[in-house]
């Protein structure tokens, strides 16, 4: 089981393929396994794909301390040093997109291009633990909350109705290594406390901003559809692409289109 000792924690990682490094960063409290459903097979054809489990998730260490997105970025940067991976394409989904922004800002030599998928720069009114999430988690139970929330946010009602097998295939992977609730909450606090809104102008790398047109379910008054507009306006060399009839999890409901858009971007 490949792990790297970085910043006093053991980080689980995998490498697939050869070529320019391509680092995939998962959403909140999610390990790297989800990328193996579609993305690893596609991009390892011509890239050195690197996935990992954040601290607090999967097979990585789970220290009971406060987490921040800066800490996650430090871990990724140290892992890249360990692997000798520089000038990489960074693909960050949701919270992973927030971590990707910090990599570009604080470790610019490590980042060739950015793909910021279904993400944002900050949560203006909701720091700490959102009350709505806490209530739902208590009422539904942790595992049911995570499962039902993933479906609600991830896909349209039409997709859920007509593709139950695909939904279950994704959930089987997502729920298999579900982290203990303590670390879900630590990740959630880290995500909600993230704020790069005043630093977007300093991101110099080309950035593709990808979002589903229906990605509007969030824990504050600004949703991912809106926050993607903020990113596009704030990052100088950026391009916004909106996927029609998609919500948060188009990497799994419409991978061919997402892959085509990303390949066009990294080819330019």
Q: Which stretches of residues belong to each language-model region?
A:
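Gly/Ala-rich beta-loop-alpha elbow adjacent to hydrolase catalytic centers
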Residues: 92, 96, 100
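Conserved alpha/beta-hydrolase catalytic His-Asp/Glu region
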Residues: 126, 145-199
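Acidic catalytic loop of the alpha/beta-hydrolase fold
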Residues: 214-222
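Catalytic histidine-centered segment of alpha/beta-hydrolase-like enzymes
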Residues: 243-255, 259
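Short beta-strand/loop motif that positions the catalytic acidic residue
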Residues: 203, 209-211
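Conserved HGGG/HGGXW glycine-rich cap/lid loop of the alpha/beta-hydrolase fold
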Residues: 6-61
């Amino acid at each position: 089981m490949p792990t790297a000792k970085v910043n006093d924690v053991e980080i689980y990682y995998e490498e697939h393929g050869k070529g320019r490094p391509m680092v995939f960063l998962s959403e909140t409290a999610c390990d790297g396994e989800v990328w193996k459903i579609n993305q690893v097979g596609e991009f390892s054809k011509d890239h050195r794909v690197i996935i990992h489990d954040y601290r607090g998730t999967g097979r990585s260490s789970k220290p009971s301390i406060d987490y921040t997105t800066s800490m996650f970025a430090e871990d990724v940067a140290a892992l890249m040093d360990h692997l000798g991976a520089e000038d990489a394409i960074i693909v960050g989904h949701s919270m992973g997109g927030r971590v990707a922004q910090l990599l570009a800002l604080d470790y610019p030599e490590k980042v060739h291009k950015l793909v910021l998928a279904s993400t944002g720069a900050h949560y203006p009114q909701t720091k700490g633990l959102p009350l709505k999430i806490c209530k739902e988690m208590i009422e539904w139970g942790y595992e049911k909350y995570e499962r039902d929330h993933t479906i609600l946010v991830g896909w349209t009602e039409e997709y859920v109705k007509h593709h139950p097998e695909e939904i279950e295939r994704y959930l089987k992977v997502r729920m298999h290594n579900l982290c203990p609730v303590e670390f879900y909450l630590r990740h959630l606090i880290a995500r909600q406390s993230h704020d790069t809104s005043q630093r977007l102008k300093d991101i110099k790398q080309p950035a593709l901003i990808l979002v589903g047109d229906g990605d509007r379910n969030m824990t504050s008054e600004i949703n991912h559809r809106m926050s993607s507009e903020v990113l596009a306006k704030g990052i100088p060399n950026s391009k916004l692409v909106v996927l029609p009839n998609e919500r948060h999890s188009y990497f799994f409901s419409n991978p061919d289109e997402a892959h085509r858009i990303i390949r066009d971007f990294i080819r330019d």
